[in-house]
Amino acid sequence: MIDVSMLALAGSLILAAQGAIAAEPAFVRTDRFIDLPSDERLFVREVRGRNTPPAAEQSAVLLVHGARVPGIASFDLPVPGGSLAVDLAAAGHVVYVLDLRGYGASSRPAAMDEDPSGSAPLIRTDDAVADIAAAVDAIRGWSGNNPISIVGWATGGHWAGAFAARYPEAVARLVLYNTLYDGTAEHETLGRGSPLEDPLRPGSFNASAFGGYRFNTRDSLFSAWNNSIPIADKNLWRDERVARAYGDAALVSDASSTSREPPSFRSPSGALADSFEVITGKTQWSASALVMPVLVIRSEKDFWSRPQDAEALAKEAPEAELVTIPDATHFVHLDRDDAGRAVFLSALTRFLDPSQSRPK
């Protein structure tokens, strides 16, 4: 277990240094597309320091978003404190932000242009693993790095874990951040007895209710976040500029969002089906196959993962460490520094630094 008080101090120093750096246009963003054999394509944004040495001399880090909000809205908001990609680029990494198929600027299945009820849940674990594999192959060519490190948030951690378990040789270091695992069968909002369970087929995902994809309004992004912030004035915990940019970027990620009232962006339902299966005992991968260094980060007030998930991941992965951030929310990387973000960033940058030995 890591001493979070020391991480908080280190994180404050990192953020102070980055504040000075960020006063200049110090980062370069390059948007790329990966063509797939299926005639679909994946969107990837590269973020690096303007004065970063040649890519082969740096460590490459891939960021994988979760179930609803795509990569840019999750990891590269254009406001202070809103870009994990910039945080990691400031630490010397070359960072890649991926949109899986069905999300953001990547290709969407044709079924997402039809009524959601007309298809089964779209973009399941195998689809996500294939997309991550394509991104990793492309990043190897762009960066000269092999293997690369991966950071997955929530369902992104589930998908990244599935990829790393299947292709361990491709992953240098793996970060599983607020990620579900089969730590316990109890989950009020995602498990048995929740809206995700089919009332006519107990133990099965309610595919008829969720269909192939779902619509998400701006307001829907903040209910769970607000409920987990332990103070009345949410702006004291979460910068209002970050919250506004998060909602804006999520809606802009879908060109059809303004065709509905209120505006809403589409996200595939496969992540929900995967999550229900994991919670109800249909394990899709084993942490014992994660032979690379693994960092498990869990926010104490996370509504998605359970303490048992983090503990099971850290216990089963052969070379894992666990950081629990007190009072932090599911969105800690988008909260204020003193609301856990500094601790999160310190733990992450320390772990991803290839020059540092990992604490025992």
Where are the language model's segments positioned?
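N-terminal cap/lid segment of alpha/beta-hydrolase-fold proteins
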Residues: 23-54
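Short, surface-exposed "cap/lid" segments of acyl-processing enzymes
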Residues: 53-97
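Conserved acidic catalytic loop of the alpha/beta-hydrolase fold
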Residues: 127-147
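Conserved hydrolase catalytic core segment
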Residues: 146-151, 155-185
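Alpha/beta-hydrolase
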Residues: 185, 189-292
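Conserved strand-to-loop "acid loop" that flanks and positions the catalytic carboxylate
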Residues: 294-301
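Conserved alpha/beta-hydrolase "acid-adjacent" motif
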Residues: 303-309
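Catalytic histidine-centered segment of alpha/beta-hydrolase-like enzymes
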Residues: 328-342
